[in-house]
Design a protein with these regions (language model features):
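Helix-rich catalytic cores of soluble enzyme domains
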Residues: 123-135, 145-150, 154-403, 410-418, ...
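Long, compositionally biased, glycine/small-hydrophobic-enriched stretches that function as flexible linkers
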Residues: 1-166, 172-177, 185-213, 240-246, ...
Length: 526
């Protein structure tokens, strides 16, 4: 695409190369380590499900057992597979025996890696086939209904705490015109080191992410999608201490979109950086394999940092998220890189700065389904001004080709949206998307004008920052508080005790198979 902003492509290339080197350097650490969340994910992918007599999820029971025996460094797949060879049990039976205190995985007679892999192979393939079937179901539905929607996807949230009430609100929103339904997680779930089991009706500020809740909402949206003749995407959150587990649950239940950003968890949830960067890699490999779009959390930086002064940190983070995604085999078309309309309305020419930032993101990441967040920080409760702010936000999306459009609510900062609030917000967006549909193709920006100058300044600062990050490494960068003005220590935060260095002979057959398929797909099947 031709650049309206006349961006310096040498700086874009320099920034992208620096981000790639940061990701490569970090990947060396990632490849040498596993975590309790990664191993619980492997357990789930092996088909281990359910809870013990104390309602502890069986994946936690098995992994905690191996942690107690100081044996996690071999990987749960090795120990479960070894027990399968020796005892003739399937993974679920092995897990139940561990839960009942009947089996110590570390005392089972050891078998060769080849024997273990052979026992695991049909189980691994069955899980991968289930994930592929969900991906095909989505693709077949889209093909049967005229393909994907052109223009922005209208993204709406539900957050009642009760999955059954969420379904009522989600189906109503879909009928009103929503393209993506995001079920907000209950407050604090990102800090739980386990995933609750079953359907849930009590949450705070959101609803628990559980596999059963995923299934129920997917079923409801499929039904309304058939009625409406269009596919309704389902979004949830695989971030926090159970990042890859929730990615696997989403892959099993046919989710389409996942919030997934280690930096967000580090900065805003104080999750240990070593832990969550390892978890993120596996979660992104799963998302790629399942055809799930990830959304990243750069928009959150602007809730604590100034959107004018710190815009370059958003762009730098987008470059880093792109690089980390590619290392996990996640292609550009599944990278919903985030940013937000968060400049103070009192800033003169603030709209031009917003438009420049959004256009710059679109030009630098042309294939990415960019995730664009509405104004929240400067929504005051004045619903009339708020509706105007949202209209300006809608205009930027339309003019610059943003894709995942998180619909702003005029009642932001007052209460959780009513059905009527959503209706008015959808009507606002649809009017602007319709009446300005091709305006972006009709206009150019003034050479040397405010927007071109602004974009050039932000790109230059982001390129310089990425050069600095390359010298420091990602860990020290975060320790210094470069992102969002928030400092986090390398050995602090939640979850560090769940990080383990891999031992010789470690196996994770799912990561191996998914990465092989992901990289092959990214390279055009070669």
């Amino acid at each position: 695409m031709a650049s309206k902003l006349h961006l310096d492509q040498s700086k874009v290339a320099k920034a992208r190369a620096a981000a790639a080197r940061v990701a490569e350097d970090t990947q060396q650490f990632i490849d040498q380590h596993t975590t309790v969340a990664v191993e619980r994910t492997v357990s789930r992918l092996l088909g281990i499900d359910g809870v013990n007599s104390a309602d502890v999820p069986l994946p936690n029971v098995v992994v905690d057992h191996l942690v107690e025996k100081n044996a996690l460094s071999q990987g749960v797949a090795f120990w479960v597979g070894n027990a399968m060879v020796e005892l003739g049990k399937n993974p679920q039976e092995v897990a139940e025996a561990v839960a009942n205190g009947e089996l110590d995985l570390t005392t089972v007679k050891a078998h060769t890696e080849d024997e273990v892999r052979a026992a695991l192979a049909p189980v691994v393939e069955a899980s991968l086939a289930k994930i592929r079937a969900n991906r095909k179901r989505r693709e077949d539905f889209l093909a049967a209904h005229g393909g994907d929607k052109e223009g922005p996807w209208i993204y709406l949230i539900v957050a009642t705490g009760n999955i059954f009430e969420d379904i009522v609100q989600a189906t109503a929103a879909a009928r009103q015109g929503a393209d993506v339904i995001a079920v907000i997680r209950t407050t604090g779930q990102s800090l739980l080191d386990y995933v609750p089991y079953g359907s849930t009706t009590e949450g705070f500020g959101g609803t628990y992410a559980t596999q059963e809740n995923f299934r129920l909402m997917r079923e409801a949206l499929d039904k309304v999608g058939e009625e409406e003749g269009r596919y309704i995407r389902l979004c949830n959150y695989c971030s926090g201490l159970c990042m890859p587990e929730i990615a696997a649950m989403g892959a099993f239940e046919g989710l389409d979109m996942m919030l997934n950003d280690a930096l967000y968890g580090i900065l805003f949830r104080d999750i240990n950086m070593q832990r969550t960067l390892v978890d993120q890699c596996f979660s992104r490999a799963i998302n790629s394999y399942a055809g799930i779009i990830i959304n990243t959390g750069e928009d959150n930086y602007l809730t604590t940092a100034d959107a004018v002064e710190e815009a370059h940190t958003v762009l730098a983070s987008q470059f880093l998220n792109e690089a980390f995604a590619l290392k996990a085999g996640l292609p550009a078309k599944q990278q919903g890189l985030g940013h937000a309309f968060e400049i103070d309305p009192a800033v003169e020419n603030g709209f031009l700065y917003e438009l420049a930032q959004a256009e710059m993101a679109r030009e630098i990441f042309p294939e990415a389904p960019l995730k664009y967040m509405p104004p929240t920080k400067f929504m005051t409760g004045n619903v009339f001004r708020g509706h105007v702010q949202d209209a300006l936000f809608n205009m930027v999306t339309c003019l610059t080709g943003q894709k995942v459009h998180l619909l702003g609510m005029m009642t932001e900062a007052i209460h959780t949206p009513f059905l009527s609030d959503r209706y008015l917000a959808i009507e606002n967006a649809q009017y602007i998307f319709r009446t300005m549909k091709d305006l972006g193709d009709e206009i150019t920006f003034k050479d040397g004008g405010i927007m071109e100058t602004r974009a050039s300044e932000v790109l230059t600062k982001a390129t310089d920052l990425l050069g600095q990050i390359e010298q420091l490494g990602i860990f020290e960068t975060i320790e210094r508080g470069i992102f969002a003005d928030i400092k986090r220590p390398r050995d602090g935060g939640k979850g560090l005790d769940g990080v383990t260095q891999k031992a010789p002979g470690y196996i994770n057959p799912f990561m191996e198979a998914m990465m092989e398929a992901n990289l092959k797909a990214m390279n055009g099947g070669n």
